[in-house]
């Protein structure tokens, strides 16, 4: 994505290939699911949340007020964000610098949540995202793909889970070392989690922050977080990762024409 004045394609214009839209709250597992479906069906994987994170990171670096929309919009319009699809997600370049890891830090996550509530900034982002997916053949994940970015997407999945499960997933993602030999199914991980008092406090803090973000996302004026009327809701609260991936594949196949 760059600051271009090229015309943005109409989202309802005829595409060469389908669009798979994955929406849902923070920590639901959208990135993992999107990467899997992109590999399985030979599509590009585009993580729109990385675009908000990149703008938030640049706002942090420029000491901008996250509550002032116009300076943030001006910043976004002068920023070059490039998403390079990889096997496990996107490589994110901010003005030519790889920030793929930095944008996952907790300060950027918190800033992105505040930046994303501004309606004019979201409208600008939607135009960029439509341009990225105009030809189809993409799995695009975010919070308003099926409702605002591509309301005519051929496949729409709303991936959800309870706040407690999402909070635990996010905690383990950012705070706990990953054991490659351990059982990685969600129920096994949840049952095996033995936290120290400090870890438990950190986990509770992440849960509070996640609930606060849920509240902001669901109540913002522009493109609030909600399932599209024709989306298939996939609740992963009690499912293993393999079960989520299998059910999502079935959903995609049921909505696409036979090869």
Q: Where in this protein do the model-derived segments appear?
A:
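Hydrophobic anchor at the beta1->P-loop junction of P-loop NTPases
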Residues: 22
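Conserved lysine of the Walker
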Residues: 30
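Hydrophobic positions on the alpha1 helix immediately C-terminal to the Walker A/P-loop
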Residues: 33
